[in-house]
Amino acid sequence: MRKVTLVFSAIAFAFSLNGVVQAKVQMPESVSSGVTTVELSQRQAVHWVSVEQIEKSLQDQPPMAIGFDIDDTVLFSSPGFYRGKLKYSPNDNSYLKNPAFWEKMNNEWDEFSMPKQIGIELVQMHLKRGDNIYFITGRTKTKTETVTKYLQEDLHIPADKMNVVIFAGDDPGKNNKISWMKEHKLKLYYGDADADIAAAHELNIRGIRILRASNSSYQPLPKAGRFGEEVVIKSEY
């Protein structure tokens, strides 16, 4: 009996020592508020959709005209824009008004752009449906361009299905894409920017948001889903 008592005493002593050691451990300095599992589960009320869900929603509809924005929607083109900023206006964004930049961007620097996987998947889905695809960009128009060529190659579009890229331009206070979307009777438009979704809403057509990559040169990032539009899941790449 005495041995049993000694064993329990030793165990109790060990636990008391462990408590003393733990009591002396200092927590590191907090660097953020942190997050709980409950908070992680409370996602924003966004209407997420997948490529498969979009395709299913169109299954009973005939082929239609649909449109895509280009930069940050089907192409990650930040390398060219970053190069242009460094070369023409490192301290501000005035390079976007410089014709020399657009000549480079529209004819050479898309060689450094990467096609987004979501762009390939969506384009291929619409091609399979027989839809007529238009690319409408806010880039400034130049006398020559190779953007059409790069898109055709990068997104695997057959030559006879590829429409020439439409350069709508970017005028302050004016959404130049609307007239082009109306002219081509688009029924659906994909874009990463608020202006893309606003243009679709203006014409009462279906606007679907593509997520802009967090490392895009186009900052700040927009609030996807803020207009109640559908947002394609995992579309940042």
From Swiss-Prot:
Binds 1 Mg(2+) ion per subunit. Mg(2+) binds at residues 69, 71, 192. One of its GO terms (molecular function) is metal ion binding. Gene3D superfamilies: HAD superfamily/HAD-like. Its cofactor is Mg(2+). Residues 1-23 form the signal peptide. It comes from the Bacteria. Substrate binds at residues 137-138, 177. InterPro entries: Acid_phosphat_B-like (IPR005519), HAD-like_sf (IPR036412), HAD-SF_ppase_IIIB_AphA (IPR010025), HAD_sf (IPR023214). It is an enzyme of class 3 (hydrolase). Its EC number is 3.1.3.2. It catalyses: a phosphate monoester + H2O = an alcohol + phosphate. Keywords: Hydrolase, Magnesium, Metal-binding, Periplasm, Signal. Homotetramer. Dephosphorylates several organic phosphate monoesters. Also has a phosphotransferase activity catalyzing the transfer of low-energy phosphate groups from organic phosphate monoesters to free hydroxyl groups of various organic compounds. This is Class B acid phosphatase. It comes from Xenorhabdus bovienii (strain SS-2004) (Xenorhabdus nematophila subsp. bovienii).
